[in-house]
């Protein structure tokens, strides 16, 4: 039987500095003792996006205090944790270095094993923490750096069914917002404006819709937004709202096609065994209510459970990193050596082809 385990998690892959203490009991149930996150939004908003050097320096300044706070809120010391889990990639290399080196130092000083965690694996396994989900299931990761449809077979067993061939969806939202003069971060700004817009005013393209492969493309949609804005300039507030609403509609229809095909493939490869299949959504874009509604309706139509973890666990956090470490420990996986290095590009499926897409938040994996 797997023993009771407790891990300190560290996350620094992009623009959130985070630390958490999480437990896993012998039956696989989770208990989050602490969850501390410091956003760098104010540091980057003036630049309209994440500046890697600023992000790395902010991690250096904040991480030690956040770890102390996480331990304090959990009412434990380093002696009370069984291991350290730190994000090792993919992401911005400067931030990864800060978090992983800190994790190494703590592991060495406290005599604890170190688990270097793939950030994407943290997202992939979160639904097991929040909903006790059984394998296999599908996960849609939609963030500023990634847009991927992943089959989750088990801990360490992932198969990428679809990925972006250019911009990630969160990146497309941010760039659209910037084109329209909206504030950073762009996703929430576009969603707010879209509420008062006419989604049928502009017929924006829906890239790759109808194709058998499950990949995504959003750069053409971004270009269409730019052209529409130029054609009707100067823009009124209503123009901006209509563009945002039409953009969101195009994204929703694209996801409906791409994910719908993925759900059908899943049902073909994994015939019903009595338990309802599940689609999990994660990443910052998962906060968008229209996109959630589209995915919920799609799952209802296809007989799937739609699982969206709480928003604070959809975006970058250390709880998911600690949980991924706990899941690995529970399988008997060996810890990493202290010479493990961060990886800016680190696909979950090791046999995947190398991608050429490169997002503003780091290499796409």
From Swiss-Prot:
GO terms for cellular component: cytoplasm. One of its GO terms (molecular function) is iron ion binding. Its cofactor is Fe(2+). Fe cation binds at residues 119, 123, 316. Binds 1 Fe(2+) ion per subunit. Pfam families: TsaD. It catalyses: L-threonylcarbamoyladenylate + adenosine(37) in tRNA = N(6)-L-threonylcarbamoyladenosine(37) in tRNA + AMP + H(+). The keyword Phosphoprotein does not apply. It comes from the Bacteria. Its main location: cytoplasm. InterPro entries: ATPase_NBD, Gcp-like_dom, KAE1/TsaD, TsaD. Keywords: Acyltransferase, Cytoplasm, Iron, Metal-binding, Transferase, tRNA processing. Its EC number is 2.3.1.234. One of its GO terms (biological process) is tRNA threonylcarbamoyladenosine modification. It is found in: Cytoplasm. The keyword Signal does not apply. Substrate binds at residues 141-145, 174, 187, 288. Transmembrane segments: none annotated. Belongs to the KAE1 / TsaD family. Required for the formation of a threonylcarbamoyl group on adenosine at position 37 (t(6)A37) in tRNAs that read codons beginning with adenine. Is involved in the transfer of the threonylcarbamoyl moiety of threonylcarbamoyl-AMP (TC-AMP) to the N6 group of A37, together with TsaE and TsaB. TsaD likely plays a direct catalytic role in this reaction. This is tRNA N6-adenosine threonylcarbamoyltransferase. It comes from Rhizobium johnstonii (strain DSM 114642 / LMG 32736 / 3841) (Rhizobium leguminosarum bv. viciae). The lineage of its organism: Bacteria, Pseudomonadati, Pseudomonadota, Alphaproteobacteria, Hyphomicrobiales. The gene is tsaD.
